[in-house]
Amino acid sequence: MHVFAISAVVITVSVIMGAIAFAVLIVRKRWLSIAQLAVFGGLCFAAAELLKPLLPRPYLINLESNPNNSAPSGHVILAAAASVMLLCAVPRVLRALVAVIGWAYTVLVGLSVIAAQWHRPTDVIMALLIVGGLALLALATTFASGMDGPGTRVSSASVQIVGSVMLTIGVLGILYGAYIIWQIQPGLAMSAEWTNAGAYVSTALLTAAVSALVLGITLAMRQLTASPLTKLGLVGAPPAPPKR
Protein backbone atom coordinates (compact mmCIF):
# COMPACT_ATOMS: atom_id res chain seq x y z
CA MET A 1 0.00 0.00 0.00
CA HIS A 2 2.90 2.35 0.76
CA VAL A 3 3.74 2.60 -2.94
CA PHE A 4 0.55 4.61 -3.44
CA ALA A 5 1.75 7.11 -0.84
CA ILE A 6 4.32 8.21 -3.42
CA SER A 7 2.87 11.16 -5.30
CA ALA A 8 4.68 10.37 -8.56
CA VAL A 9 3.25 6.84 -8.61
CA VAL A 10 -0.34 8.01 -8.21
CA ILE A 11 0.07 10.70 -10.85
CA THR A 12 1.75 8.33 -13.31
CA VAL A 13 -0.79 5.53 -12.92
CA SER A 14 -3.72 7.93 -13.15
CA VAL A 15 -2.33 9.68 -16.23
CA ILE A 16 -1.79 6.31 -17.91
CA MET A 17 -5.37 5.29 -17.16
CA GLY A 18 -6.65 8.58 -18.54
CA ALA A 19 -4.51 8.24 -21.66
CA ILE A 20 -5.83 4.71 -22.24
CA ALA A 21 -9.38 6.04 -21.88
CA PHE A 22 -8.85 8.70 -24.55
CA ALA A 23 -7.02 6.24 -26.80
CA VAL A 24 -9.97 3.84 -26.60
CA LEU A 25 -12.40 6.63 -27.48
CA ILE A 26 -10.25 7.69 -30.43
CA VAL A 27 -10.15 4.12 -31.74
CA ARG A 28 -13.92 3.87 -31.28
CA LYS A 29 -14.36 7.32 -32.91
CA ARG A 30 -16.41 8.69 -30.02
CA TRP A 31 -15.53 12.34 -30.55
CA LEU A 32 -18.26 13.85 -28.39
CA SER A 33 -17.41 11.41 -25.61
CA ILE A 34 -13.83 12.68 -25.74
CA ALA A 35 -15.09 16.22 -25.17
CA GLN A 36 -17.42 14.98 -22.43
CA LEU A 37 -14.62 13.28 -20.50
CA ALA A 38 -12.25 16.19 -21.08
CA VAL A 39 -14.72 18.55 -19.42
CA PHE A 40 -15.25 16.04 -16.60
CA GLY A 41 -11.51 15.77 -16.02
CA GLY A 42 -11.13 19.53 -16.07
CA LEU A 43 -13.87 19.99 -13.48
CA CYS A 44 -12.29 17.36 -11.23
CA PHE A 45 -8.93 19.11 -11.49
CA ALA A 46 -10.54 22.47 -10.75
CA ALA A 47 -12.30 21.03 -7.71
CA ALA A 48 -9.03 19.66 -6.36
CA GLU A 49 -7.17 22.92 -6.87
CA LEU A 50 -9.80 25.53 -6.06
CA LEU A 51 -11.76 24.06 -3.16
CA LYS A 52 -8.81 23.36 -0.88
CA PRO A 53 -7.81 27.01 -0.29
CA LEU A 54 -11.44 28.13 -0.05
CA LEU A 55 -12.90 25.60 2.38
CA PRO A 56 -12.32 26.01 6.13
CA ARG A 57 -10.75 23.26 8.24
CA PRO A 58 -13.32 22.59 10.98
CA TYR A 59 -12.19 22.04 14.55
CA LEU A 60 -13.10 18.49 15.57
CA ILE A 61 -11.29 17.54 18.76
CA ASN A 62 -8.58 18.99 21.00
CA LEU A 63 -5.68 17.62 18.99
CA GLU A 64 -2.55 19.31 17.71
CA SER A 65 -2.73 19.30 13.92
CA ASN A 66 -2.08 21.39 10.84
CA PRO A 67 -4.62 24.25 10.79
CA ASN A 68 -4.51 24.49 6.99
CA ASN A 69 -7.32 22.83 5.07
CA SER A 70 -6.51 19.55 3.34
CA ALA A 71 -9.89 18.71 1.85
CA PRO A 72 -10.59 17.42 -0.70
CA SER A 73 -7.71 15.04 -1.40
CA GLY A 74 -6.25 15.84 -4.80
CA HIS A 75 -4.63 12.42 -5.14
CA VAL A 76 -7.91 10.63 -4.48
CA ILE A 77 -9.74 12.89 -6.93
CA LEU A 78 -7.09 12.07 -9.52
CA ALA A 79 -7.32 8.31 -8.93
CA ALA A 80 -11.12 8.22 -8.84
CA ALA A 81 -11.48 10.48 -11.89
CA ALA A 82 -9.06 8.34 -13.90
CA SER A 83 -11.01 5.22 -12.94
CA VAL A 84 -14.31 6.82 -13.95
CA MET A 85 -12.91 8.02 -17.28
CA LEU A 86 -11.63 4.57 -18.17
CA LEU A 87 -14.93 3.00 -17.12
CA CYS A 88 -16.87 5.38 -19.36
CA ALA A 89 -14.55 4.79 -22.34
CA VAL A 90 -14.35 1.00 -22.58
CA PRO A 91 -16.93 -1.15 -24.40
CA ARG A 92 -19.66 -3.06 -22.59
CA VAL A 93 -17.74 -6.31 -22.09
CA LEU A 94 -15.02 -4.54 -20.07
CA ARG A 95 -17.10 -2.15 -17.94
CA ALA A 96 -17.58 -4.42 -14.94
CA LEU A 97 -13.91 -5.43 -14.87
CA VAL A 98 -12.74 -1.82 -15.11
CA ALA A 99 -15.13 -0.84 -12.31
CA VAL A 100 -13.57 -3.43 -9.99
CA ILE A 101 -10.03 -2.43 -10.94
CA GLY A 102 -10.86 1.25 -10.51
CA TRP A 103 -12.44 0.55 -7.12
CA ALA A 104 -9.37 -1.32 -5.88
CA TYR A 105 -7.01 1.38 -7.14
CA THR A 106 -9.05 4.20 -5.61
CA VAL A 107 -9.30 2.45 -2.24
CA LEU A 108 -5.55 1.83 -2.15
CA VAL A 109 -4.80 5.47 -2.91
CA GLY A 110 -7.35 6.67 -0.35
CA LEU A 111 -6.03 4.48 2.46
CA SER A 112 -2.43 5.29 1.54
CA VAL A 113 -2.82 9.06 1.83
CA ILE A 114 -4.55 8.56 5.20
CA ALA A 115 -1.85 6.20 6.47
CA ALA A 116 0.84 8.64 5.34
CA GLN A 117 -0.97 11.37 7.33
CA TRP A 118 -1.43 13.53 4.26
CA HIS A 119 -5.17 13.65 4.75
CA ARG A 120 -7.93 13.02 7.23
CA PRO A 121 -10.53 10.36 6.34
CA THR A 122 -13.10 13.08 5.64
CA ASP A 123 -10.77 14.55 2.99
CA VAL A 124 -10.85 11.24 1.13
CA ILE A 125 -14.62 10.82 1.46
CA MET A 126 -15.20 14.36 0.18
CA ALA A 127 -12.96 13.72 -2.82
CA LEU A 128 -14.84 10.54 -3.70
CA LEU A 129 -18.23 12.24 -3.46
CA ILE A 130 -17.07 15.14 -5.63
CA VAL A 131 -15.92 12.77 -8.36
CA GLY A 132 -19.11 10.73 -8.09
CA GLY A 133 -21.33 13.79 -8.38
CA LEU A 134 -19.42 15.18 -11.36
CA ALA A 135 -19.47 11.76 -13.03
CA LEU A 136 -23.26 11.55 -12.78
CA LEU A 137 -23.63 15.06 -14.17
CA ALA A 138 -21.32 14.21 -17.05
CA LEU A 139 -23.14 10.97 -17.85
CA ALA A 140 -26.48 12.79 -17.75
CA THR A 141 -25.27 14.77 -20.77
CA THR A 142 -24.26 11.69 -22.79
CA PHE A 143 -24.76 12.20 -26.53
CA ALA A 144 -25.99 9.65 -29.02
CA SER A 145 -22.39 8.89 -30.01
CA GLY A 146 -21.81 7.70 -26.45
CA MET A 147 -24.31 4.89 -26.88
CA ASP A 148 -23.32 1.39 -27.88
CA GLY A 149 -23.62 0.65 -31.57
CA PRO A 150 -27.02 -0.34 -33.01
CA GLY A 151 -27.58 -4.04 -32.57
CA THR A 152 -25.19 -4.21 -29.61
CA ARG A 153 -27.33 -2.26 -27.14
CA VAL A 154 -28.09 -5.17 -24.86
CA SER A 155 -28.12 -5.77 -21.14
CA SER A 156 -24.96 -7.03 -19.45
CA ALA A 157 -24.99 -9.78 -16.83
CA SER A 158 -21.56 -8.75 -15.57
CA VAL A 159 -22.64 -5.13 -15.15
CA GLN A 160 -25.82 -6.21 -13.34
CA ILE A 161 -23.96 -8.51 -10.95
CA VAL A 162 -20.94 -6.32 -10.26
CA GLY A 163 -23.02 -3.15 -10.07
CA SER A 164 -25.49 -4.73 -7.62
CA VAL A 165 -22.68 -6.07 -5.43
CA MET A 166 -20.83 -2.74 -5.38
CA LEU A 167 -23.96 -0.77 -4.56
CA THR A 168 -24.88 -3.22 -1.79
CA ILE A 169 -21.37 -3.09 -0.32
CA GLY A 170 -21.44 0.68 -0.55
CA VAL A 171 -24.75 1.20 1.24
CA LEU A 172 -24.24 -1.45 3.94
CA GLY A 173 -20.61 -0.44 4.48
CA ILE A 174 -21.54 3.21 4.96
CA LEU A 175 -24.27 2.29 7.44
CA TYR A 176 -21.98 0.02 9.46
CA GLY A 177 -19.13 2.52 9.36
CA ALA A 178 -21.44 5.25 10.63
CA TYR A 179 -22.60 2.89 13.40
CA ILE A 180 -18.99 2.28 14.50
CA ILE A 181 -18.31 6.02 14.61
CA TRP A 182 -21.47 6.54 16.66
CA GLN A 183 -20.27 3.88 19.11
CA ILE A 184 -16.79 5.35 19.61
CA GLN A 185 -17.76 9.02 19.41
CA PRO A 186 -17.83 9.58 23.21
CA GLY A 187 -14.19 8.52 23.49
CA LEU A 188 -12.88 10.40 20.46
CA ALA A 189 -13.00 13.79 22.17
CA MET A 190 -10.71 12.42 24.90
CA SER A 191 -8.47 10.49 22.47
CA ALA A 192 -9.22 7.33 24.43
CA GLU A 193 -7.13 4.34 23.42
CA TRP A 194 -10.16 2.06 23.21
CA THR A 195 -11.37 4.06 20.19
CA ASN A 196 -8.29 3.27 18.09
CA ALA A 197 -9.51 -0.04 16.68
CA GLY A 198 -12.91 1.38 15.82
CA ALA A 199 -11.35 4.43 14.18
CA TYR A 200 -9.10 2.27 12.00
CA VAL A 201 -11.91 -0.10 11.01
CA SER A 202 -14.40 2.68 10.26
CA THR A 203 -11.81 4.56 8.18
CA ALA A 204 -11.00 1.54 6.03
CA LEU A 205 -14.65 0.49 5.80
CA LEU A 206 -16.00 3.90 4.82
CA THR A 207 -13.23 4.47 2.27
CA ALA A 208 -13.97 1.13 0.61
CA ALA A 209 -17.74 1.56 0.88
CA VAL A 210 -17.94 5.07 -0.54
CA SER A 211 -15.58 4.05 -3.35
CA ALA A 212 -17.80 1.07 -4.11
CA LEU A 213 -20.90 3.26 -4.10
CA VAL A 214 -19.35 5.83 -6.45
CA LEU A 215 -17.98 3.26 -8.91
CA GLY A 216 -21.13 1.13 -8.68
CA ILE A 217 -23.45 4.04 -9.47
CA THR A 218 -21.15 5.16 -12.28
CA LEU A 219 -21.12 1.64 -13.71
CA ALA A 220 -24.91 1.42 -13.66
CA MET A 221 -25.32 4.92 -15.09
CA ARG A 222 -22.83 4.24 -17.88
CA GLN A 223 -24.69 1.09 -18.88
CA LEU A 224 -27.99 2.98 -18.88
CA THR A 225 -26.62 5.76 -21.06
CA ALA A 226 -24.97 3.28 -23.43
CA SER A 227 -28.02 1.01 -23.69
CA PRO A 228 -31.13 2.92 -22.61
CA LEU A 229 -34.04 0.79 -21.45
CA THR A 230 -36.14 1.33 -24.56
CA LYS A 231 -36.69 -0.76 -27.65
CA LEU A 232 -34.52 1.60 -29.60
CA GLY A 233 -31.75 1.63 -27.03
CA LEU A 234 -31.77 -1.89 -25.65
CA VAL A 235 -32.00 -3.99 -28.80
CA GLY A 236 -31.42 -1.47 -31.55
CA ALA A 237 -33.80 0.11 -34.02
CA PRO A 238 -36.73 -2.08 -35.13
CA PRO A 239 -36.59 -3.35 -38.71
CA ALA A 240 -38.11 -1.01 -41.25
CA PRO A 241 -40.96 -2.32 -43.43
CA PRO A 242 -39.92 -3.38 -46.93
CA LYS A 243 -40.12 -0.70 -49.58
CA ARG A 244 -42.45 -1.32 -52.52
Predicted regions and their residues:
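Arginine residue identity/basic-tract feature
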Residues: 28-30, 57, 92-95, 120, ...
